[in-house]
């Protein structure tokens, strides 16, 4: 959770001038402490909520039956109290963000997704993608903590207008919002994308004017790559429980694909992940032009593809020891590659 937020700082934690140098509304250590606190409390609340909601199922699966709540060492009331206390702690840390009200609006989609996640396997075979969304949302909150808008939905979800806060994008701001961010040079990979429902559905007559959704391309691609990274890892982890999931009627990517085709699905996710990281680098503003340096491409897309590719190739989905080893240790290879690639961009851009 914290790593996803830290990655956002390297992926565009502010924008200051035509050279692509970055400036932050707060000292970098202050922002990192905020992200550490928010990640700590959110992770506690999310894990406890997942265990609480899953307790009736966990007691039916040998691998999870000895967890604290199913075995009765922690009462459901105590677990719920722990969830609420840590959720309150996460909410309090939002007060330290440059725009607390805006930070809450950006956090709300992930709050709802995290509450739903334990029930996703009851309704769909794609709970790994739901989990990926929840964990990758740290990219959004890392951007917001740095004073950046990773996306804006009209005036409904955006940061409070403030000329002192840098923006990841400002090409399509609605009238009445004035920011001093210069427009980057044209590129084949635009730094922003604007989606308008009336434009996307030209043959549909809407009785209202829906707000336009403006997306920062670097953050959209980094968010997608982070979500797929988590989905790949959790799919390997979920392979341990495929027999119990089939017996209980629960869904997962291994259940959907079967163990024989799960690796093919993982290779497909990895290809999309690598493509997103390449697009992220191509759309980053910098050096008077647009695009990341060669160090980014070598470490982020290259390193992640190599590390995840080795994991998908080597893991034995039928061996719990193999899946657990890769789930536990392979994380550091991918995380290190991402931190190194995006960190190389951040170091060269901070004012």
Where are these regions (language model features)?
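Multi-pass alpha-helical membrane architecture of UbiA-family
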Residues: 1-351
């Amino acid at each position: 959770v914290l790593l996803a937020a830290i990655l956002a700082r390297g992926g565009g934690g502010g924008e200051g001038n035509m050279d692509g140098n970055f400036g932050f509304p707060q000292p970098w250590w202050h922002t990192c402490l905020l992200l550490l606190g928010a990640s700590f409390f959110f992770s506690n609340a999310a894990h406890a909520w997942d265990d609480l909601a899953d307790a009736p199922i966990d007691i039916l699966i040998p691998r999870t039956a000895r967890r604290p709540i199913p075995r009765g060492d922690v009462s459901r009331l105590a677990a719920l109290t722990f969830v609420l206390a840590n959720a309150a702690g996460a909410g309090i840390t939002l007060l330290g963000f440059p725009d607390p009200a805006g930070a809450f609006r950006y956090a709300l989609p992930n709050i709802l997704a995290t509450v739903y996640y334990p029930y996703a396997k009851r309704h769909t075979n794609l709970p790994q993608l739901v989990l990926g969304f929840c964990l990758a949302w740290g990219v959004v909150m890392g951007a917001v903590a740095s004073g950046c808008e990773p996306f804006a939905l009209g005036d409904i979800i955006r940061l409070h207008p403030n000329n002192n806060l840098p923006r990841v994008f400002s090409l399509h701001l609605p009238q009445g919002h004035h920011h001093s961010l210069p427009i980057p040079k044209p590129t084949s990979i635009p730094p922003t994308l604007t989606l308008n429902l009336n434009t996307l559905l030209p043959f549909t007559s809407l009785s209202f004017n829906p707000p336009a959704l403006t997306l920062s391309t670097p953050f959209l691609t980094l968010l997608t790559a982070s979500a797929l990274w988590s989905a790949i890892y959790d799919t390997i982890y979920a392979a341990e429980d495929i027999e119990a999931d089939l017996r209980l009627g629960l869904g997962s990517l291994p259940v959907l694909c079967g163990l024989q085709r799960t690796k093919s699905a993982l290779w497909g996710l990895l290809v999309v992940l690598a493509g997103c990281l390449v697009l992220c680098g191509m759309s980053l503003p910098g050096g008077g032009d647009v695009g990341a340096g060669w160090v980014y491409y070598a470490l982020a897309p290259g390193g992640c593809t190599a590390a995840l590719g080795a994991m998908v190739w080597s893991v034995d989905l039928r061996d719990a020891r193999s899946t657990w080893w890769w789930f536990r240790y392979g994380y550091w290879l991918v995380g290190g590659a991402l931190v190194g690639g995006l960190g190389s961009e951040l170091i060269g851009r901070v004012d």
